[in-house]
Design a protein with these regions (language model features):
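Bacterial N-terminal signal peptides
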Residues: 7-16
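Structural scaffold elements adjacent to functional motifs in cytosolic proteins
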Residues: 45-47
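Short, surface-exposed ligand- or partner-binding patches at beta-edge/loop junctions that are enriched
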Residues: 89
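Rhodanese-like catalytic fold shared by cysteine-dependent sulfurtransferases
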Residues: 2-5, 19-37, 43, 52-85, ...
């Protein structure tokens, strides 16, 4: 009985560890590190906020695909080449983490702005309207 219990615990722990490793297959970066990363001209800047939020201001060179839309995955995979690194941002960092998970599941290399567009603005980084 003890062996079964111990084996169950080991199985559960290894499952949790493998899930955690899969969930973090993208890099979350500070505003300063994100800014450095997107200076690479091969990196595609993706803003996953709504069209209205994007129109109010965004990071220079970003394209907009709303992660809240049901066709996000389809649009993103049809638009973005898997050969490029995708730099994702949203307003606060929550939606970009969801988008990053979807993109990495589809074979993309992804970096994500941890503090979102709000953190980008608070750090005094350039925005365009």
């Amino acid at each position: 009985m003890k062996k079964i219990f111990i084996m169950s615990i080991i199985t559960m722990l290894s499952s949790l560890l493998s899930c955690q490793a899969q969930n973090k297959s993208y890099k979350s970066l500070s505003a300063d590190d994100y800014e450095k990363a997107i200076t690479d001209t091969t990196v595609i800047r993706l803003d996953v906020r709504t069209a209205e939020e994007f129109a109010d201001g965004h990071i220079r060179g970003a394209i907009n695909i709303d992660v809240l839309k049901s066709d996000f995955e389809q649009k993103a995979t049809a638009t973005l080449p898997t050969s490029k690194t995708i730099a994702v941002n949203c307003r606060s960092g929550k939606r970009s983490k969801n988008a990053a998970a979807i993109l990495t599941k589809n074979g993309y290399k992804v970096i994500e702005l941890d503090s979102g567009f709000n953190g980008w603005q608070a750090a005094g980084k350039e925005i365009v309207k």
